[in-house]
UniProtKB/Swiss-Prot annotation:
Keywords: Antiviral defense, Phosphoprotein, Two-component regulatory system
Taxonomic lineage from the root: Bacteria, Pseudomonadati, Pseudomonadota, Gammaproteobacteria, Vibrionales
Gene that encodes it: dtcB
Stated role: Possible phosphate scavenger member of the two-component regulatory system Detocs that confers resistance to bacteriophage. When the system (DtcA-DtcB-DtcC) is expressed in a susceptible E.coli (strain MG1655) it confers resistance to bacteriophages T2, T4, T5, T6 and SECphi27. Detocs inhibits T5 infection leading to growth arrest but not complete cell lysis, during SECphi27 infection leads to cell lysis. Overexpression of this protein along with the intact Detocs locus cancels T5 immunity; when the phosphate-receiving Asp-53 is mutated to Ala in this protein, immunity is restored.
Any single GO BP term: defense response to virus
Name of the protein: Detocs response regulatory protein DtcB
Comment, domains: Consists solely of a response regulatory domain.
Family annotation (CDD domains): REC
Covalent S-S links between cysteines: none
Length: 149
């Protein structure tokens, strides 16, 4: 089971296309679009891999209440939940459309963020990639490699 935590419908559809291409249309995938649903899922199950956005809303949009504002550290909340459950060895690919990730109130370039999450949070199998909608080749390549591993 692959858990995809992504609130952008276009980006999640592109990720799902890659999952189907690499693993096949029968791949077991759970797609959630907010921190609360990701944490609930992780409370009940442990996926084999996670593809994680960093800027996520705290909860699902409720009828008549508007869309929740994405939190720049929403993905970190998911990582903290994984750490609480001692799942620091779970394969994780951070896929974010921002060039930097705010970690402990400090902006860290995406390319350096995986090392920071290893050193500061104890994750052992974490990668990070910049999602560039203008140049899809690098992030698609990285995502396919992650899915194949």
């Amino acid at each position: 089971m692959i858990l995809i935590v992504e609130d952008d419908a276009h980006k999640s559809s592109q990720i799902l296309e890659l999952v189907n291409l690499v693993i096949g249309s029968g791949a077991e995938v759970k797609l959630v679009d907010n921190v609360m649903d990701a944490v609930r899922f992780l409370f009940e199950m442990t996926p084999e891999k996670i593809i994680l956005d960093m800027s996520l809303p705290s909860h699902k949009a409720l009828p008549g209440q508007g869309t929740p504002v994405p939190l720049p550290t929403g993905g970190i909340e998911v990582l903290l939940e994984l750490r609480m459950k001692s799942h620091m060895g779970l394969p994780i690919l951070i896929l974010t459309q921002y060039p930097e990730i705010e970690i402990e109130d400090e902006p860290v370039p995406v390319a350096e963020s995986a090392l920071t999450f290893q050193e500061e949070y104890g994750f052992t199998d974490i990668e990070a990639c910049y999602y560039d909608h203008n140049d899809s080749k690098p992030w698609k390549q990285k995502t396919m490699e992650f899915l194949k591993s």
